[in-house]
Amino acid sequence: MGRTVRDESTASAYWAAVNTFCALKDVHVLADAPVGCYNLVGVAVMDYTDAVPYLENFTPTSLTEKEIASSGSSEIVRQTIEKLQAPGRQLILVSSAESEMIGSDHERMLKMHYPEVRFFWSNSLGENEWQGRDRALKWIHEQFDDQKPAVVEPGTVSIIGPTYGCFNSPSDLLELKRLISGAGGELRHVYPFESSLNDISALKNSEVIVVMYREFGEALAGMLGRPVLHAPFGLAETREFILELGGLLNKRERAEAFLKLEKQTTLKPLWDLWRGPQAEWFPTVRFGVTAAKSYALGLKQFLEGEMGMQCLFSHNSAETDNTLIRNEIKEKQPQFLFGRMPDKIYLAELEAKTRFIPAGFPGPIVRRALGTPFMGHSGMIYILQEIVNALYDMLFNFLPINRRTSSGEVPPGKIVWTSQANQILNEMVKRAPFISQISFGRELKRKAELLAVKQGSDTVTPELLKMVS
């Protein structure tokens, strides 16, 4: 019997192809898909992920029941190509799950009638969005590289990533550019996001390649024959990145000078927070992460490995089981959860006191401003600042404020607790985030006593306590 998938949060390779190819300035993507598949990827979700109202270089064939049930999609593909062909515009035809199900492989037809149009079999039914991005970038190199030998330009660096649909990419990309420049590198290309299609041939001429994400880009980087680094998270990784890049570019002294300057400027808030009273909270902070691989690994490494906070779980959202995540949230009650919209929904369903911090898709969020990085030195400061400010908010919310209450909310008379009920209450309070334990215990006790009164009892028992927990 097959496993039921709950709240699938990772898109298919069809989405990957659209998000990758449409990021190139001179490419127009033709999707062999129903109009709904166009609207969902190119209009609706694009506005939630990238704050882009729609993709201008994306057109569907608008498959109907006729094409899917009988005639196939070749005729409608040819009609759409005729409308879209224009000088300086490279058309790429992409398969969707629907066209793949009816076996619409247009490779042969295109070679006969439209040899300049390329066909990418997205494998929508077989791969997820990260596998699809990796293969799409490799495919571009195979199709459009000029096959000339590399002419390496000393001191130059190119970045692979991001595409559309990568969480928080404007801020992370800016931080990565800043680190490269500080280490003495001259940025050549950001592929595909700030590039044209044929820039693929120029990537091999860069002295160093930086892969921005652990999720994709490795396949293309491996074809270029250049030294490869990955975008860093946290203190140790960022230091190593700067020094290693400086060494590869023969600019080690420049990199060391930049690192020294960073300690006096960008990293100064980290040192101040570490020496301040806020640092006393750090060992008590319990957090969880559910995000794409780069963020899942990076946040755990920085917050647990370097800041001494307690990581209750860290999941790669492309591989994890959302039912298990919901259960883990319920059982472990993290103080902070870096996650996606499904995780935020689980918190609401469980009435959890956890502070939610967006860290991945799906989920509607605008991150076009450049001040919210997670990567590099700037990312460390932003994340730590968010956590400390959230702790201040929590303290405010847990103050014993005198609220106006309706009659019946304060239990009349004295309510007795059995020793077993008290023991269970203490155990439940211990599992709550440290900073909120007093407030959590007080609220749970109030609810239990109110329920006892409603039931006509003057005693809280273990059975009654479990009814409100």
Residue ranges of model-derived segments:
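An N-terminal assembly and electron-transfer interface module characteristic of large anaerobic redox
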Residues: M1-V416
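Non-catalytic accessory segments flanking P-loop/AAA+ NTPase cores
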Residues: R403-S469
